[in-house]
Amino acid sequence: MSSRRDAREQVMKTLYANEQTDGDAEQALHALVRVPLDEDPSTRDFAEHLFRETLKTMEEADEIIEKHADNWEIHRIAAIDRSLLRMATTELLKFEEVPPKVSVDEAIEIAKRYSTPRSGTFVNGVIDAILLDLHDQGRLNKTGRGLIGMDTIQERAGSS
């Protein structure tokens, strides 16, 4: 498991806990991100940044998710799936250095591990539709390593 995977799993847990308890985001961040990832500062920093950006972007992400989750209102999506979709959408929108394929694949794999048997397929369908739509809108602003795989997305977007 990559250290970024560890970070994403902890962020998903933190988003979930924060939403379920309507609690203090800083307390959740400390307990579920800072303490478990304390020995790896770069992973911890990535996780903290992802958590904070996801909270900042949540309203926008929810609108995007609802648009692509056919017949699903955001509050009806399983809480873990909702957290993962918010996190992955935030990565697509705000993390220029993260390749879109990585954001998508990580969300799917974490969904398979932590959520329902069908969650991997559901998350895949929704986040893939989001990815193509963001590309078509010119909202995937990737640089450096984030450009890896963009040619494949452009090909897929052109054929849809």
Curated annotation (Swiss-Prot):
Name the Gene Ontology biological process terms: DNA-templated transcription termination; transcription antitermination
What function does the entry list? Involved in transcription antitermination. Required for transcription of ribosomal RNA (rRNA) genes. Binds specifically to the boxA antiterminator sequence of the ribosomal RNA (rrn) operons.
Q: Which gene encodes it?
A: nusB
NCBIfam families associated with the record: nusB (TIGR01951)
Claim: Kinase is one of the keywords in the record: no
Q: Which UniProt keywords apply?
A: RNA-binding, Transcription, Transcription antitermination, Transcription regulation
Query: What Gene3D superfamilies does the database record attribute to this sequence?
Result: NusB-like
The UniProt entry, under InterPro entries, shows: NusB-like_sf, NusB_fam, NusB_RsmB_TIM44
What name does UniProt use for this protein? Transcription antitermination protein NusB
Family classification: Belongs to the NusB family.
